[in-house]
């Protein structure tokens, strides 16, 4: 495997974005590396999916109609770990600059990913986040 290639086989990613094109392109990027992607359109759907499916990684847009990514990460972090409260998460957003990055990290996301994102950059961040997911590090390292 070349250094820029990531193996995401078996990594369950929950993607939330209200834009159909973004959902389709990001899901396709991650599936290229073997991730299993569940894509939803709203923060409410994402919160329910976190509790129901316990994804390994959460990728969320920040600006969505009704409730956005900040609302979502606040609700996720308020959950007990066994219900998804410790799910590793990244904000995938068009909001750029150090002030937005700082706000994202303070809110409870581990990464701030600026749109547009390259295939390999996205895969690397998801790979890093997956290593921090409960039970995933061993599964990834033994491949």
Question: What are these model-derived regions, one by one?
Answer:
Residues 20-38, 107:
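Two-component/phosphorelay signaling modules centered on CheY-like receiver
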Residues 34-41, 49, 113:
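Short hydrophobic/Thr-rich beta-strand motif most characteristic of the beta2 strand and flanking loop
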Residues 53-59:
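Active-site beta3 strand of CheY-like receiver
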């Amino acid at each position: 495997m070349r250094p820029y290639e990531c193996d995401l086989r078996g990594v369950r990613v929950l993607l939330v974005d209200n834009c159909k094109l973004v959902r389709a392109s990001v899901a396709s990027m991650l599936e290229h590396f073997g991730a299993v992607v569940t894509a939803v359109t709203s923060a409410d759907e994402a919160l329910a999916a976190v509790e129901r499916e316990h994804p390994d990684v959460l990728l969320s847009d920040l600006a969505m109609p009704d409730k956005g990514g900040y609302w979502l990460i606040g609700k996720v972090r308020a959950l007990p770990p066994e219900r998804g409260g410790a799910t590793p998460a990244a904000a995938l957003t068009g909001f750029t600059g150090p002030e937005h990055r700082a706000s994202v990290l303070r809110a409870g996301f581990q990464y701030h990913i600026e749109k547009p994102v390259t295939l390999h950059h996205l895969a690397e961040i998801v790979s890093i986040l997956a290593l921090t997911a409960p039970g995933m590090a061993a599964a990834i390292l033994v491949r």
